[in-house]
Amino acid sequence: MKEFLHYKTVRNNALKLAYRMYKEGFIPDVIYVSLRGGAYMGNVISEFYKAVLKGTSHKPVFYAAVVARSYTDIKSHESVAVDGWTYSPENLRPGDKVLFVDDIYDSGYTINFLVNYIMSKGPKREDIKVAVHDYKVQEYLDKNLNITPDYWCRKHIIKAQCDEIWIHYMSHELIGLTDEELEKYYFNDDPELREVFSVIRW
């Protein structure tokens, strides 16, 4: 199954999620967005904290990013490669509150690696929160991962591989679109996009 998720839906859900975190008393010192997927939602959450803390004595929430990806090596082991941090975890101190933001928790390998890496620099697990728009619980897989999202907008229970869903985030994804999907989700709203998409090699 494939779902097209409009950016307005992600924006509104991100605002509600940020409000929930704030009402529960969680104000991060640092927000790390996972590029690319976490950027849009992270921007919204960052803006919420900037607005809600304006005029208070609370220090601003620092906004940063990490580029990381999971892959399967030649021995079929899941590995994670980190291409860079805009704010080095070496600067974190015990007691710092950290928020990781991503669009989806799917395999979970990348976020597990990143959270464990941050904990190796001092912050404790209770001071690190993971927020995602979509949290996929793949019951048919035996992953045995310790780090799962603390906050999410939607939770999907996937009991079998045939039940898997492909979520297309319209805020930043273009690859994998059929002619029918382009027509329905892009050209119907703005016919000028036909020319834009004509130079894209699928």
Name the predicted role of every residue range.
Residues 1-27:
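Active-site-facing substrate-recognition patch
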Residues 23-25, 49-58, 87-90, 119-125:
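Alpha-helix termini
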Residues 54-98, 106-116:
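Short, glycine/charge-rich flexible loops or terminal/linker lids adjacent to PRPP-binding catalytic cores
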Residues 65, 100, 130-132:
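Structural beta-sheet core signal
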Residues 116-202:
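PRPP-dependent phosphoribosyltransferase catalytic core
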